[in-house]
């Protein structure tokens, strides 16, 4: 079975062959690539949740009069999703600073667009530490 024709069936067949030790005919290069893709997917999900978290914390900080239950839920949900990802993938803890640094500009741009506030309102560099981002008690 070719992975391009029916990925699901290819994956199930490959997994079964691996379990039984039948390596003949397995596309080991493709299997390795798929495993790497799964790892990248987890890292991408973490980056996405961090961007959402930073965006809403910026709005929370710089538009206090507009704070809402919706914003609070977005912040709480992002933190919960991040905590779950880090619990399931502890090695991603070592990538947090890199991801925050890389994704903050997108969060900042989103805050500028969503709030309509001048760009100078929002710091160029992330104003939140990793500890603050992950702390369920931190709000401003």
Language-model region placement:
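Surface/interface-facing alpha-helical segments and adjacent flexible terminal/loop regions used
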Residues: 1-140
